[in-house]
């Protein structure tokens, strides 16, 4: 499955705008639904750490440890593309609306307790790196 950023880059490149789900809960603004976005390069770093610290094998939560909104992700994507944000909010499909998670955030305490202390990329850093190096036409890995 392709990342939200991958889809966003392509939507913006093709249409000049992107779509996000409208909120169906009063405590969240449209696009205010939150996820713990983590950059794949950070996941690789953690995997490498765990490979070298085998005595600490087990099941670990993995994320940045900080929930950010889809609106933040959209703005970071537009910024990485050098474009002004243009976001269209659409209804969450009825068949998933009641099950849709509005907030997820990884508890990173177990990983930190075994000595992992490397900083994770911010959302803006991860989106910028991914877009610049992998998604934009002319990127070194395009």
Tell where the protein language model's regions lie, with residue ranges:
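Short amphipathic alpha-helices and their capping/turn segments at secondary-structure boundaries
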Residues: 6-12
